[in-house]
Amino acid sequence: MTFNTETFMLKNQAAIQLYEEVKRQPIFDYHCHLDPKDIFEDRIFDNIVDLWLGGDHYKWRLMRANGISEAEITGPASNLEKFKAFARTLERAYGNPVYHWSAMELKNVFGVNEILTESNAEEIYHRLNHFLKEHKISPRRLIADSKVMFIGTTDYPLDTLKWHKKLAADESFKTVVAPTFRPDEAFIEHRHFVDFITKLGDITQKEITDFSTFIAAMEERIAYFAQNGCRASDISFTEIVFEQTDELELNDLFNKVCEGYIPNQSEISKWQTAVFMELCRLYKKYGFVTQVHFGALRNNHSTIFEKLGADVGVDSLGDQVALTVNMNRLLDSLVKKDSLPKMIWYNLNPAYNIAVANTLANFQANELGVRSYLQFGAGWWFADTKLGMISQMNALAEQGMLANFIGMLTDSRSFLSYQRHDYFRRILCTYLGEWIEEGEVPEDYQALGSMAKDIAYQNAVNYFKN
């Protein structure tokens, strides 16, 4: 069996037949970390390292595991030296998804069919750089070639959305680039919380003195995002908590933190519960899909974090006590307050997949006719792997309705990462194909093919309609 052919990751004849239904589907990439400024300015890339390795902490993490020096990863080494160091790593990375993604990117974007190794790295490096210039490879070119219809970026609540506005006004660019409201700094444990409150007051021209004035100012920013095409919010929590309190304590806590007080864990939980519930109320009011990423234990290597900052490859799976207790109480409280928006829950630790899918199934009732109003999101980050995807789909199929799943997202900072949608589609088709091959579902290719197409694209389109 050869590697990375037309039938790559398609393990049976049923999968091959199903893949014919999805391989030409467009991409609805509802969550990523691309910079809209880069999309608007559309500069032509002139070096493969900037495009392929720059900012990619998946690759950095792998290179560190292979003994590569930091100089050749994020430091002053030349681009050729960094490329060779990555090739030296990649040729030993069997079993890691980066090995598959890289092979797919090289072949499908650049036409490089060879396996990248240390011995051919320099020749391929120069060939790729020539390809970039000859074909004028730019962000918009990569987006168009991948048939990306929608991009959901991740945006600071006080952003002017200048670049989103420019893109929306550019009739030559057909892909919708929508902002996503990401209020990490609104939570008191964030190191920039006090600075955020000051800037929030300045931009909204409101005097923020307590919890209610804080929420009022946040609503003004949510309304601004809604006016500029926003369809979703996002937040990342280390743990899902539920600890209620009254507004008097929240006001006292707000003022103490603004004066330099360091909150304890119970106070952090109370603030997180109160703020998130208020935000959910507003997200429902403005029609935002609410994305919740949870379970990441971040910035664990303090020396690297202090030198390079966040999102550089030193994060881990987290664990927590009473996850389902807290999730159920939180969701039930939102229902009681008529504040439950459409939500996507992304669980990082696969050990909790069945528990999360089972909990979400308790709260699917809605009068809007929305299929799977609460979505169990695709495996993300460390679960963005073959086994991670299968684990997530297994849990969803057994505890909910896989046919309503909104499918894949890149969650990436790279313009080359759209190959992950194809990777997911191939794994999805093998997963469904095994059901057919093993007699677990009828051999109805029309029905299963339609299901695969829905998961690959159409379910997300429908779910994100305002």
Swiss-Prot record:
Source taxon at top rank: Bacteria
A Pfam cross-reference name: UxaC
Keywords: Isomerase
Pathway membership, UniProt: Carbohydrate metabolism; pentose and glucuronate interconversion
Biological processes per GO annotation: D-galacturonate catabolic process; D-glucuronate catabolic process
The EC number(s) this enzyme carries: 5.3.1.12
Gene Ontology MF terms in the entry: glucuronate isomerase activity
Reactions the enzyme catalyzes: D-glucuronate = D-fructuronate; aldehydo-D-galacturonate = keto-D-tagaturonate
InterPro entries the record matches: Metal_Hydrolase, Uronate_isomerase
PANTHER family according to UniProt: URONATE ISOMERASE (PTHR30068:SF4)
Family the entry assigns: Belongs to the metallo-dependent hydrolases superfamily. Uronate isomerase family.
HAMAP family for this protein: UxaC
Name of the protein: Uronate isomerase
Originating organism: Streptococcus agalactiae serotype III (strain NEM316)
Gene that specifies this protein: uxaC
